[in-house]
Amino acid sequence: MADQNASDRCTVLVTSCDRYRDIEAPFLALWRRHWPDCPFELVAVRESGGDDGGTAADGFDRVVATGPGLSWSEMLAFALERISTPYVLMLMNDYLLDSRVDTARQLELLSRAEAADALNLRMNPNPPRAVKNSAYAVSCQAGYWNREFLLGLARRTKSAWEFERYGSYMFDESDPRPIMVTERKEFPFVDALHKGYWEPEGVALLKREGIGYDFSRRGLPPFWPRLKSNLKKAVFAVFPWELVVRVQNVFNLGMK
């Protein structure tokens, strides 16, 4: 399909919030540097509008301003209701591009999702399988989503945590449309923040790319949050993901 039709097929939706607006400048600087020929509209969702308090996009093609008081999922649904393309590439605003995006390859992957009528094509094989009603069948990792399906998930959950943990078990088994995952990581980004703190990889990326940032605004995590994160990684490394996630869901453990 011709590139000029790409903007009718898919929209990039960046989930943000006013508390994380300081991340948008490095996000956009790296986006324009590493994907200058992105064929899709770049839309951000957050509580407030542009710098003028209204519709200014602040470097995005469009900002959807929800107003205060909505949960993460409610903000996601609000934005999706204002997008018309059948597919959405959903990203978090701390997913910072670390190398050039291959536009032709992205269009191939979108075509693969369209040809299969896929509900989701996840571009990070972690976990390596895509199985409905299993751990991380739904993930905030970079991927192409059927917009209507994504909207349905957003309306049934509240937080990003619920979206992943509970949404993974909300599939209708009678729906033949697949969920898919690529064999290798196909979208080149660093997950730069964790629980509001910079990850070392994110700091290193900014320094390598010469992107300025005032780290007095937010820095690296203190000892205890870092220890908790490392312990969680160890649990997932030792025990089956399915077991861990089901226990978390039953007892509301690890909620973000």
Residues of each region from the PLM?
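Conserved donor-nucleotide/metal-binding helix-loop-beta segment in metal-dependent transferases, i.e.
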Residues: S99-P125
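Membrane-proximal basic amphipathic "stem/tether" segments
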Residues: D8, A116, G210-K256
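Short, flexible, basic/aromatic active-site loop/helix in glycosyltransferases
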Residues: P127-A135, F149
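Catalytic core and acceptor-binding pocket of nucleotide-sugar-dependent glycosyltransferases
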Residues: V138-E201
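Short beta-strand-to-loop acidic/aromatic patch adjacent to the donor-nucleotide binding site
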Residues: P86-L96
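PAPS-dependent sulfotransferase catalytic core
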Residues: I179-S229
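N-terminal anchoring/stem segment of glycosyltransferases
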Residues: M1-P68, L80-R82, P86-Y87
